[in-house]
């Protein structure tokens, strides 16, 4: 009887990965990158690294097939959010309890990364034993997904992914295949006013009051946008605001950082017009203020492609493994595959992984072991299907 801690399966890899701190910001990805590099098979596997930021790397492992493009690609990020507080479990402990593994990244997305590693290693073993691949198989482990997603941008720039490739991330999707994304546009909006004593406010121009007008107008404009049949409604969050100096001083400066999640047909250019109009109305309402803005993030929406070859194959594999009709939905956040789809126009990008996104980024984050087992089986089956594995 093999002890599971000695069996190099996705459950084992999940625990090993969770025990390595790869928080962003914090310890970052180097330890986990080095660990993955150390466990990957060397025979028949081409391993590449690429520096994304100082001492922060992407890692790619490739088993070459007769056809290099399209390749089947698993892309998984190595970083997690910060460990945080209010845990009742050790965030780096990988404790197994009642069919769950606890720890930072257990759900998002070290269990998904573990499933991809396990599937890749199994295909590598089968190739070593004499199987041949028609299409190449790649495992890309990316940096910085939890921040500005510079890892996947570097992978695109390095040519590690192509428009024609079949690409899947293993983000937590709660048993669903998620194939579409709302766009994500970020703005930094600033209102400049005129300072004055609070006893004579008419001598100044209240930047905070003007920003309140901007926020109100943007919120109402976003609420008026039509919903999308798959992606739902567009939303806006005013995540951070800074303004004023003291309660008794008319504020001469206010800045707000805005996160918009946009559904078709609204894009960043259209959102920019909403911001411009909001600033204009604030300037007309509060005399003496002047507003300006900059776009700090621009990720386009990604719509479902009913004709996607990867989608059909992934659904068939998932249905066969689970014995159920796997649901197809959209991913509420933005992922590495969404960046690839939006940048390259790749219509074969999607998410499927263990865990529930609602558990991510929280204390006592966990993933169900049965979820890991399911996903591992699906990924192995998908890898064999998409690479067109053949006997010698």
Region annotations inferred by a language model:
Residues 75-77, 140-142, 168-171, 190-192, ...:
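Short beta-strand segments
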């Amino acid at each position: 009887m093999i002890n599971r801690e000695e069996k190099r399966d996705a459950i084992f890899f999940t625990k090993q990965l969770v025990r390595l701190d790869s928080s962003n910001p914090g310890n970052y990805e180097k330890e986990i990158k080095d660990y993955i590099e150390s466990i990957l098979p060397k025979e028949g596997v081409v391993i590449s690294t690429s520096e994304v930021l100082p001492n922060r790397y992407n890692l790619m492992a490739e088993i070459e097939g007769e056809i290099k493009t399209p390749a089947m690609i698993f892309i998984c990020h190595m970083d997690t959010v910060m460990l945080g507080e209010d845990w009742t479990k050790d965030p780096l402990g990988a404790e197994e309890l009642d069919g769950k593994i606890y720890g930072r990244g257990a759900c998002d997305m070290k269990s998904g990364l573990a499933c991809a590693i396990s599937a890749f290693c199994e295909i590598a073993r089968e190739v070593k034993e004499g199987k041949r691949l028609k299409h190449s198989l790649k495992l890309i482990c990316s940096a910085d997904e939890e921040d500005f997603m510079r890892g996947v941008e570097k992978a695109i720039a390095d040519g590690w992914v192509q428009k024609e490739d079949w690409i899947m991330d293993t983000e937590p999707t709660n048993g669903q295949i998620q194939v579409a994304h709302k766009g994500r546009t970020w703005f930094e909006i600033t209102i400049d006013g005129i300072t004055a004593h609070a006893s004579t406010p008419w001598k100044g121009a209240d930047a905070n009051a003007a920003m309140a007008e901007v926020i109100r107008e943007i919120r109402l404009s976003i609420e008026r946008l039509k919903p999308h049949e798959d992606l739902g409604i567009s939303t806006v969050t005013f995540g951070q605001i800074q303004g004023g100096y003291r309660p008794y001083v008319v504020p001469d400066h206010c800045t707000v950082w805005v996160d918009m999640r946009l559904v078709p047909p609204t894009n960043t250019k259209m959102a920019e017009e909403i911001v411009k109009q909001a600033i204009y109305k604030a300037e007309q309402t509060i005399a003496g203020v002047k507003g300006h803005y900059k776009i700090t993030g621009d990720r386009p929406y990604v719509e479902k492609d009913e004709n996607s070859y990867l989608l059909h194959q992934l659904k068939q594999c998932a249905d066969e493994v689970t014995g159920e009709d796997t649901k197809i939905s959209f991913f509420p956040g933005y992922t590495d595959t969404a960046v690839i789809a939006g940048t390259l126009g790749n219509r074969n990008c999607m998410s499927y992984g263990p865990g529930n996104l609602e558990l991510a980024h929280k204390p006592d984050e966990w993933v169900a072991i049965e979820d890991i087992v399911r996903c591992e089986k699906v990924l192995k089956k998908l890898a064999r299907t998409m690479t067109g594995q053949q006997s010698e």
